[in-house]
Amino acid sequence: LALPVLLARCFGAAAPVRQPVPNVILITIDTVRADHIGCYGAKNIQTPTLDALARDGTVFERAISQVPLTWPSHAVILTGTYPFQNGVQDFTGQPLDERFRSVAQVFKQQGYATGAVVSAFVLDRSWGLARGFDFYDDAFAAETFQTKDIGLVDRKAGESVTRALKWLNKNRAHTPRRPFFFWLHLYDPHSPYDPPEPFRTQYRGHLYDGEIAYADHELGRLMAWLKQSRLYEGSLIIMLSDHGESLGEHGEIEHGFFIYNSTVHIPLIVKPPAGSGLRPGRVAKPVETTAVAPTLLRLAGLKGEEKEFQSSSLLGGTATSEDPAYSESFYSFSSFGWSPLHALQTSRYHYIEAPTPELYDVVADPGEKNNLAPLQAATVAVLEDKLQALLRKNPFQPAESAGAGLSADALEKLRALGYVAYHTPVSPEALAAGLPDPKSKLWEFNAILEASDAFHASNFPAGEALLSQVAEKDPQMYIVPFMLGEAAARAQKWAEASVAFQKCLQLNPTFDQAMTGLSRVLVYLGKTDEAALWARNALKQNPANYRAWYELGLIESKTDKNAAIADYQKAVSIQGNLAPLRRDLGLLFFQQQNYAEAAEHLAKAAELGVNDAPLYNFLGISYGHTNRLPKAVESLKHAIRIDPKLAEAHLNLGYAYQRLGQESAARKEYGEACRLQERFCQLDPATHP
């Protein structure tokens, strides 16, 4: 497939002049439809920052996202590869393969300082996009989910821009002559639509636009900083979205399920650095986001590095209406076992390959309401041939097992962001028989999303009622009992959860997350032997399931602490940032009087957000036993700040002060311990352990 490229005359012909190495800024604003931006013709929204950037650069009027999901789309943007090439087609696979280099790695290799601030868990470093960045501020790693509210799986544009400016200022102060590559990701337009004031009032009735306007406003702070720092003119700035938002069109509420233009037509603006010889303009032909990475390198003057990427840049060459743009969605396939969708777009037509094919004349029918496929078989055949030629180079290999899916933590975070992300096994027989068209499964999909929302709102009856209806329509959908089991477990309905997880495993015997969930609830039901068996079954299916290692460790900690420590250590080797895991491992080491190991893991748990007085007390004792008395004092004082009535912390702090020779401070803490607990009044400080 030839990538649509841009004629130099579209920018305006001018002789390029030699230019110092430019700073490079990539801005991605999540979930923005092109037709909801002022410079793309939107009338009911104010986007002055993006409109100003458009006046200084080139607006690509038909930029097409290759996949309408945040993480897979950003993998395309940063690597210049199609989803079927890099393997990132949904949320259910593995992190980005290290074979695929990102532009950050190239810029770093070329001597650039590299930084990124992302605004949602869907771009957490665990997915693999942090490679090449000196600084990658995600703040949504697994540990924060374990110790903080689920709402912290994303953050507002204001906070992200503030973090970005902090890094930019620090970088400029330390290395003012070193060029930088910086990526800023803003998440606000993604649902739920909840803009702050005054945008909430100003955009009442269309809060999605309010989110875009708010993101634009905050982005203005970055542009102001660039101008005040005299960096704007000489910087290369590319702004685009990862995908759009359906807003109810074609029955889809948000995005990811279908690939109509409401979710794949995105804004793309390129502001070249001063001296590039490129003038502002507009380009009407379709272009792909695969072109962003090589364009960044070419406009930065790294033409040799540009050749490393499979796609062409947006510059040079010849663009014709016959250079189609590709899109796909495997969301319905991977999570539900329904047919995947593939599409090609030309300047006039949008062809969607599905069990019921679709063809739209996007010039005459921009809303894609009139399917021309039954009437224009010749056009469909031409585009289908082009599509198959592309896909034959990378044949699709579906998984026959759903066992090695995402962790429970990742699943929960994605559900909090509105995604249903499971890995459904599809047999060769099912493929041969033909998979359901997602269009015919829209009701079930929306019902599952509504049920997930109901469970997160603690409305268990509503969620259960919706899923019961889904199960009636499709009794083989194993996701239904799994979701019921997860919801019942959150509501501490252990018996119900056990029944649901077992039903799930009858439908999908390879699903290790259901095994882990069943193990967890069986512990609460007092069936520890059976719980251990299911945890081990999960690990046979997926040895990288750190949650199963953790569950097994919790079970074995009652009878065999050495075995439990081994289980916990295995879990830590896979996921070292799970705060409760670090806490429990540290406490086991403490019980075995291995104070050095105890201090390491308890300190990590504290770093990850566990703000618990007993933990800091044990940490202080561990520091004391390893002769790190200043740290012991610091930890014990923190324990007392959390709980001033924790007598043990006062006692241990007194002992630490005594060892430091601070007798007055020691007597004060001993006195407080005695006041709080009479039994401590009889202790001889000289013999305190």
Q: What is the predicted role of each segment?
A:
Residues A2-W494, V499-Q502, Q506-R520, Y524-K527, ...:
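Catalytic domains that recognize anionic headgroups
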Residues S458-A465, R490-K503, V523-N537, S557-K570, ...:
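Structural signature of tandem alpha-helical TPR/SEL1-like repeats
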Residues Y655-R659, F680-P689:
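TPR/TPR-like alpha-solenoid helical repeat scaffolds
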Residues A14, N508, R582, Q677-R679, ...:
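Extracellular/secretory pathway and lumenal proteins
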